[in-house]
Each structure stands twice: as C-alpha cells, then as structure tokens.
UniProtKB/Swiss-Prot annotation:
Job description of the protein: Part of the phosphoribosylformylglycinamidine synthase complex involved in the purines biosynthetic pathway. Catalyzes the ATP-dependent conversion of formylglycinamide ribonucleotide (FGAR) and glutamine to yield formylglycinamidine ribonucleotide (FGAM) and glutamate. The FGAM synthase complex is composed of three subunits. PurQ produces an ammonia molecule by converting glutamine to glutamate. PurL transfers the ammonia molecule to FGAR to form FGAM in an ATP-dependent manner.
Stated name of the protein: Phosphoribosylformylglycinamidine synthase subunit PurL
SUPFAM superfamilies reported for this sequence: PurM C-terminal domain-like, PurM N-terminal domain-like
Compartment annotation: Cytoplasm
Root EC class: ligase
CDD domains to which the protein is assigned, alphabetical: PurL_repeat1, PurL_repeat2
Top-level taxon: Bacteria
Encoding gene (name): purL
Record-linked HAMAP family: PurL_2
One Gene Ontology molecular-function label: ATP binding
Catalytic activity of the protein: N(2)-formyl-N(1)-(5-phospho-beta-D-ribosyl)glycinamide + L-glutamine + ATP + H2O = 2-formamido-N(1)-(5-O-phospho-beta-D-ribosyl)acetamidine + L-glutamate + ADP + phosphate + H(+)
Binding annotation for Mg(2+) 2: 130, 286
Family membership noted in the UniProt record: Belongs to the FGAMS family.
Main location: cytoplasm
Length: 764
C-alpha cells in the first residue's frame, strides 16, 4: 500500500499547513527563506531535504566564513601538486611517478556516544566511501579517539564499543589501521570524539569527481538497500533504543545511528574499482550524511543541467517508507553514479558480477531543477544549488572568553617538581603508567595493521608508512595529531602545535610532508567563546601551512560537542601526508638495530610545561602558555631527517611531544627491546631535560660509524644537537646516569598494564 504523500501541487494549494520545521532543526528565518526560494511552502520531502542539507554538519553554515581563510592563504606554489581540494569528497595529491593519493578525516562523534559500536564502525565506512568516490582504492585507515575520564563508569562502555566498531569494520574491509591517538579527559565525558582518516591510491588519470552532466545520462543507485537507519543523523540525533524492526510498531525505536555491513562495502569497493577501470562512470557520489538528499543535490548542483529522480524505484529494506524518509535515510554502503545510456548495461553487468544491487532511479535533464517523483507525482521540485550550496551562512559573534587571561596567568611554574633521583624515577613511572601516556597496545592489537602486505610502519611508529608501488618501493606516510589542552590555552598556537607534531611525525619516518587534512572538533557555535577558539584555530592552522609550504586539501567541522553548558576541550585534529621514494629507507622508532648506536637529541629544550601531561597527571593542572612553535625549525628538522634517512645515517627516530624526552626514550627502548644509558647535560635541570614538552625536537639513534658525519651535517645546517646517550645492547634497563635505573621489565609492566586493568584484558 502506497502511503499518502505531500505533493508539490498540494503544497501550493495548502500554504497554511503547519510543518514541523523546528523539530527538524530549522530556525524560523531558515524556514521562511525556503518558502521564499520555492514561492510556496515546501512539501514534506522538500522540508526533509532542506533540513538535513542546511544542518550544521552538511552546510558548514557557522564555519564557512572562517574556512575561507584556508583558500585565501593557499598560494599557487602550495597548490601545484594538489589535484582536488576543499569542496570535493576528499583532497587528492600528486605524489609522483604517476601516482595520486586521496586522504581525508571525518568525525562521527555524536553517533559514537549513542551507539558506540555502530557509530564508530559506520564512521570508518563513511570515510572509506569518500575515498572510493574519488576513484581510488582505499589502502589504510587511522583514528583519532577522545574519551572521558578513564576511570568513569561509562567510559568502558564507550571505549569497548568504539574500539570493537573500528576494528570490526576496518578488519572486515581488509584495511590496515596504521596509527592514530587515544586520549582520556573528563571534558569528553558524554561527548567522545571518533575521527576516522582514510587514504586511497590511484593513478593520476583515474581521478573521479562528483558531478552530473550530459542530458539523458542515467542516475544509478547501487549498493545496499535503503532502510530507516540514520534518519536525522545529521540534523536531530535521536537516541531511542534500536529494536531491529523496520516495520510497524518497532519503526519509532530505530536509532538515528546508521547500521553498517562491512562485507557489503568490501564488495562495493571492488565493484567500483572495476567500473572505474572500464570507464563506465561519468560522475560519482557516495551516500553518507543526508543520504539521497545530499547525493542528488550535490551531483546536480555540480553539473551542467538538472536531474529527475523516480523515488519509487529506490530498493527499500523497510515497508511503507515515505519519500521524506527515503531521501533522509543514511543507510550505509550506497553509491550514486552518473552513466551514459550506452554504458548502462555494461555497468549493470559489473554490478551483477559482484552481486551488488543496482537500479536506474533517474536521469540528467536539460533544465535547472532537481525534480523527484513518487509513483508519478512530483514531491520535490527545487533548484539544486539552494539545497546543496546556497544554504544559510552565519557570521556568529566571536568573543575571547573572559576566563582566558586567568587561564594563561595560572602557570605551572609554582607547582612542586621532582628534585631527587627517587622522585624523578617515580615521576617517570607514574607518567608512563597514566591513562594519558600509557601504551595503546591493548587498543591497537584489536586492529589488523598489516593486512594487504603493504604496511611498512604502523602503531607504535611515529607515522604509518604504506608502500604504494611494489616495483619502485614508493610509499606514503600518514600521521594525525591534536592537543585539546594546548588549544584550550591558546587556540592559535594549539592548532599550530598539532600541525607541527604531525609534520614532524611524518618527517621522523624519513618521508617528506606534502599536504594536510583536518577535522575541527569544537563546542556550540552559538557560544561566542567557542567561535573565537574556532576562528583562532583555523587561522593558526592556515598560517602554519603557509609557513611550511603545504596545502590544506580538505577537512571536516564538528560543532556542538558539549554536554549542557560544558564544551569539550577544543580539538583541531590535523593529518599530514608525506611521500617517501623508497620505503626500504624508512626510519623505525625502536632503537638497537645497529650495535653501539649513539642517541642524539635534535632541537632546543626549554622550560615549557604549560598544558603539559606532567602538570595534568601529577597536579591535575591546566594553565599557562603552551610550548613555542617554530616552523622554520620544523622544516630544518624535516630536511635533516630526510637527508639522514637517504644517506643511511639514522637507524631510529622518535619525535618528542607529550611526556618529553623520558616518554620518547621509554617508547624507543621498549620498541627495540634494548636498554640504553642516558647522560643528561651537566648544566641542565634534570627534570626539565626529561619532561619538558618543547616542540621541534626528535630523538635519533645514529650508528657509531655515522656519528661524526651526522653531527657535522647538523652543524652545517645550524640545527642544535646534543649527544644524550648510547644504546646498550648488553643491558636490559633504562639508566639515567647519576640518577636512576629501571629494568625494561618494570618499564613494560608499567607502560602496558594500565589499559588492560581499566578495560579488561579483552573486550567483552
């Protein structure tokens, strides 16, 4: 039985019908503008389309005025290797030898609190489809995770579901998870962050874009059937319990969190790649947030004509779905392609080969309207650009918070510091066993890091490294970083510190950083203080990219990350892509590969503890000024690391960030299963040397035979260095001479024991 629907003609004849636009997230003036655009009230289906496409998630209505700064500051020199940038499904970069890499990071924060497993799983699935839509084969994923306090009763539920969701979906797709970050902080209680990155590889000529052109070309929906899951996911996130019943009484209990099937997506990947190889696709768009509303309006808006869709031809998973529900559904594993009439049968044949359901649901028209019919009646008739690109843009109030001065003035300088050898030893053990700094092995071992056989480096390396060409050994490096604590103290500097660390992590593997993506996680845009944080972070990131000469290729904004009046720590996640001409020269993290290595600390160490993990773990303190950022130094450091890798002068490298030198030495020693002796400079404060979080520093292990050549290179380039110790392959301890010694077994127990104790040796 076909449900009664609200048609365009009915809407024109009944202008005074009350509509639930506020419940769908639209404001009074936004609803009035829709009526002005259409010259009448919208139909139920049109209202559904505008509400999801004009949502903060899809329209960027509060962030657009600030995001323009990325484009304004990107120079032609920075753009020269960029094949696709902001506005496309994902950024694409020419990485040489005819290869292109596409990469992007997206958020799935709110769904991952409501339904952690499916929220995280479909976050992975969604970003993978963005990469597929560019014409690439997905080759790796990463994740940036933020949870509430590690000892909070609800944190275990969220951690368990999110980690299993990421692993379950990514492992089933056969995609290696090569790195990321996991942070615990009370500000994320009730509002975890799940940011997933995916990278894909293709030949330069295989790039595909999302546009519908060519009058008469067919619109084909292929992949999974359309159900009721995910409706309202991008506009009004519901939290009813999922009953699994998509018909009758159970319908109202369906979650707004999407339900994923990785095996359907795995087949969809191979199907898409064969379609691309056969040149059967004119334009393509994945179905993610806002579902068909987004896919059809964006394809039509980017094309040179209009589009007509027959909605009753969409294969459904649930009985009696309305047009509004079909257009709003965020059911996963679906793609929408534009195909010439003569290629439709060949397209369908490929889909049949892979057992992928495919249906012609419409065609490109010569008009300028997006028209959607339902059993012959018109339920949508709109200018597509007004849905996809011409939504409201707000220049919201920006105000530096009143508390900012007091926060900066509350420095950690007066906090008690460890003074004796025993106190230094205990501080080190306390920090490496804290949830903030302890090993993430319990999490990462639930992910397959080496599937497909092209992973060269993965967690716990500074960056993931993937081989993309078996013949030449060409590869890419990926790193993601963020620091909400630094960004809270100074949003401009905090975003720059995240960029600097991701840049440095990529360089520490021997790769050359080439491009940036981001995911900007903030509180409510209706709070002027949050908008100030956002504005400053965007400017800091953009200015940093100019200083480094690498472009922002795209990104994502996630607002409303707060519980009540309490916003999360502002968390701009930055991803950096690097290129390495031969993965055989990659630099690992673990020391001890060469006998008698010398440990050298590159960069300057200063007394910088504002926002540090030491202040948090030992004193529960957040205040002061974050570490200084010096992008010229970061570039110099990257050049030295790349040259050292190319000339065989570096056998291991590990960047210094949270936890400082002490954390870096512990991680490098445990990774290499090798002891070492650290000799602190006589004129330096041992506490500052061990725990400072000054930026622009890397610990390198240099073969004894290369020490003179390497240090001369550093001096010639005016890069500060200090000989900080030696690798002692006959030792099973970390010794800080004149202060303390800790057996590697004790270090490992402290470092690796925390998460299993908190969350169980295995996930439930």
């Amino acid at each position: 039985m076909t449900p009664q629907v609200d048609t365009v003609s009915a809407a024109a004849a009944t202008p005074d019908v009350a509509q639930p636009y506020k419940e769908l997230g639209l404001k009074d003036d936004e609803y009035a503008r829709i009526k002005e655009i259409l010259g009448r009230r919208p139909t139920d289906a049109e209202l559904a389309m505008y509400s999801v496409m004009w949502s903060e998630h899809c329209s960027y209505k509060s962030s657009k005025v600030h995001l323009r700064y990325f484009g304004e500051t990107t120079t032609e020199e920075m753009r020269k290797s960029m094949l696709a940038g902001i506005g496309e499904n994902a950024g694409v970069v020419d990485v040489g030898d005819g290869w292109a890499v596409t990469f992007k990071v997206e958020s799935h924060n709110h769904p991952s609190y409501v339904e952690p497993y499916q929220g995280a799983a479909t976050g992975v699935g969604g970003i993978v489809r963005d990469i597929m839509a560019m014409g690439a084969r997905p080759v790796a994923v990463m994740d940036q995770l933020r949870f509430g306090a590690a000892d909070h009763p609800d944190t275990r539920r969220v951690v368990d579901g999110v980690v299993r969701g990421i692993g379950g979906y990514g492992n089933s797709l056969g995609l290696p998870n090569v790195g990321g970050e996991t942070v615990f902080d009370a500000s994320y209680q009730g509002n975890p962050l799940v940011n997933a990155l995916c990278a894909g590889v293709m030949r330069v000529e295989d790039l595909h874009l999302a546009f519908a052109s060519g009058t008469g070309n067919k619109i084909i929906l292929f992949g999974a059937r359309t159900g009721l899951d995910g409706i309202g996911g991008v506009s009004v996130l519901a939290s009813d319990t999922f009953s699994g019943d998509e018909s009758g009484a159970g319908r109202k209990k369906l979650p707004s969190v999407q339900v994923g099937d990785p095996f359907t997506e795995k087949v969809l990947i191979e199907c898409c790649l064969e379609l691309y190889a056969a040149k059967l696709v004119v334009g393509i768009q994945d179905l993610g947030g806002a579902g068909l509303s987004c896919a059809t309006s964006e394809l039509a808006a980017a094309g040179d004509g209009g589009m007509r869709i027959e909605l009753d031809k969409v294969p459904l998973r649930a009985a009696d779905m309305t047009p509004a529900e079909i257009l709003s559904s965020e059911s996963q594993e679906r793609m929408c392609a534009v195909v010439t009439p003569e290629n439709v049968e060949a397209f369908m044949a490929v889909c049949r080969k892979w057992d992928v359901l495919a249906t012609v649901i419409g065609e490109v028209t010569d008009g300028d309207r997006l028209v959607v019919t339902w059993h012959g009646e018109t339920v949508v008739d709109v200018p597509p650009r007004t849905v996809a690109h011409e939504g409201p843009v707000y220049e919201r109030p920006v105000q530096r918070p009143d508390y900012q001065d007091a926060l900066i003035a509350d420095t950690p300088d007066t906090l008690p510091r460890p003074a004796t050898a025993d106190e230094l030893r205990e501080t080190l053990l306390r920090m490496i066993s804290s949830p903030q700094l302890c090993s993430r092995k319990w999490i990462t071992e639930q992910y397959d890091r080496y599937v497909r056989g092209n992973t060269v480096l993965a967690e716990d390396a500074d960056a993931g490294v993937i081989r993309i060409d078996e013949q030449t050994g060409r590869g890419i490096a990926l790193a993601t970083d963020a620091s909400g604590r630094y960004t809270k103290l100074d949003p401009y500097a905090g975003a720059q510190l995240a960029l600097a660390e991701a840049f440095r992590n990529v360089a520490s593997t021997g790769a050359t950083p080439k491009a940036v993506t981001n995911c900007l996680n903030f509180g409510s845009p209706e709070d002027p203080g949050v908008m100030w944080q956002f504005q400053q972070a965007v400017r800091g990131l953009a200015d940093g990219c100019v200083a480094l000469g690498i472009p922002v290729t795209g990104g994502n904004v996630s607002f409303y990350n707060q519980t009540g009046q309490d916003a999360i720590l502002p968390t701009p996640v930055v991803g950096v892509l690097g290129v390495i001409d031969d993965v055989h020269r990659r630099i690992p993290t673990g020391i001890g590969l060469e006998p008698g290595e010398t440990l050298i600390l590159l960069g300057d160490t200063r007394d910088e503890f504002g926002g540090s993990i030491w202040a948090q773990v030992v004193h529960d303190h957040l205040g002061g000024v974050p570490p200084k950022v010096d992008f010229a130094r970061e570039q110099l450091l990257a050049e030295v690391l790349t040259a050292g890798s190319r000339d065989g002068m570096i056998s291991a490298a590990h960047d210094l960030s949270e936890g400082g030198l002490a954390q870096a030495v512990v991680e490098a020693a445990l990774a290499g299963e090798t002891g070492c002796r650290i000799l602190l400079p006589e004129d330096a404060d041992p506490f500052v040397t061990l725990f400072s979080e000054s930026a622009g520093r890397v610990l390198v292990a240099v073969p004894r035979s290369e020490e003179t050549r390497f240090t001369r290179m550093c001096e010639a380039r005016q890069l500060p260095w200090v000989r900080i110790g030696v690798v002692d392959q006959g030792s099973d301890a970390l010794e800080v001479q004149g202060h303390f010694s800790i057996p590697l077994t004790e270090l490992r127990a402290a470092f690796e024991g925390t998460l299993p104790k908190l969350f169980g040796a295995e996930t439930a």
